């Protein structure tokens, strides 16, 4: 049982780390000479432009930012609730509250990555002065980590739903 508990905690911490990296790091769309994410665009690794309200489709990127931040916060809250439930639940009860919050985190990261997937091309075309060489780009590791975090938070949420507290 102790090994299973250690695995679940490690899996949850890994999910949270993936969410933090995907949210913070500047690699949602990358090319040879630029890096772009939902916070800023950097060309030549030196010239960075912060994405602000002068940016067209800014509300779309704000939705991605908000749902990624919310996903990360919910994942951290779910971990603390899990730790509390370890001490507060009676034997045989399920970790339903932790599961619900973790599945909400999963839903938020899925929404963020889906919005970015759907709207990326429009964002780049409408802001061509910020994205001068985006045609040569591809999805970066932060974007991929967001989808991996989606899978991890989903699996984690399902594990909590199935898991029962034992002695």
Curated annotation (Swiss-Prot):
Pfam (any one): PMP22_Claudin
PROSITE patterns xrefs: PMP22_1, PMP22_2
Domain of life, per lineage: Eukaryota
Location, primary (coarse class): Golgi
Transmembrane segments: 1-21, 67-87, 95-115, 143-163
Keywords carried by this UniProt record: Cell membrane, Cytoplasm, Glycoprotein, Golgi apparatus, Membrane, Nucleus, Transmembrane, Transmembrane helix
MF-aspect GO terms: integrin binding; kinase binding
Cellular compartments annotated: Golgi apparatus membrane; Cell membrane; Apical cell membrane; Membrane raft
Membrane-topology annotation of the record: Multi-pass membrane protein
GO cellular component, one term: perinuclear region of cytoplasm
GO BP annotation list: actin filament organization; actin-mediated cell contraction; apoptotic process; bleb assembly; blood vessel endothelial cell migration; cell adhesion; cell-matrix adhesion; early endosome to late endosome transport
Glycosylated residue positions: 44, 47, 52
Function: Functions as a key regulator of cell membrane composition by regulating protein surface expression. Also, plays a role in regulation of processes including cell migration, cell proliferation, cell contraction and cell adhesion. Regulates transepithelial migration of neutrophils into the alveolar lumen, potentially via mediation of cell surface expression of adhesion markers and lipid raft formation. Negatively regulates caveolae formation by reducing CAV1 expression and CAV1 amount by increasing lysosomal degradation.
Similarity section: Belongs to the PMP-22/EMP/MP20 family.
Record text on subunit structure and interactions: Interacts with PTK2; regulates PTK2 activation and localization. Interacts with ITGB3; regulates the levels of the heterodimer ITGA5-ITGB3 integrin surface expression. Interacts with P2RX7 (via C-terminus). Interacts with ITGB1; the interaction may be direct or indirect and ITGB1 has a heterodimer form.
Protein name: Epithelial membrane protein 2
Origin species: Pan troglodytes (Chimpanzee)
Lineage of producing organism: Eukaryota, Metazoa, Chordata, Craniata, Vertebrata
Gene (name only): EMP2
């Amino acid at each position: 049982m102790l090994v299973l508990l250690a695995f679940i905690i490690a899996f949850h911490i890994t999910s949270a780390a993936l969410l933090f990296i995907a949210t913070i790091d500047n690699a949602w769309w990358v090319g040879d000479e630029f890096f772009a994410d939902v916070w800023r665009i950097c060309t030549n690794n030196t010239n960075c432009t912060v994405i602000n309200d002068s940016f067209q489709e800014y509300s779309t990127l704000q939705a991605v930012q908000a749902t990624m931040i919310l996903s990360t916060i919910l994942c951290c809250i779910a971990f603390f609730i899990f730790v509390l439930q370890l001490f507060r639940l009676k034997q045989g009860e399920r970790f339903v509250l932790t599961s619900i919050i973790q599945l909400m985190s999963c839903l938020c990261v899925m929404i963020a990555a889906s919005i970015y997937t759907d709207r990326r091309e429009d964002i780049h075309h409408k802001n061509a002065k910020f994205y001068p060489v985006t045609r040569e780009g591809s999805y970066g590791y932060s974007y991929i980590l967001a989808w991996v975090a989606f899978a991890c938070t989903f699996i984690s949420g399902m594990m909590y739903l199935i898991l029962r507290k034992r002695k």
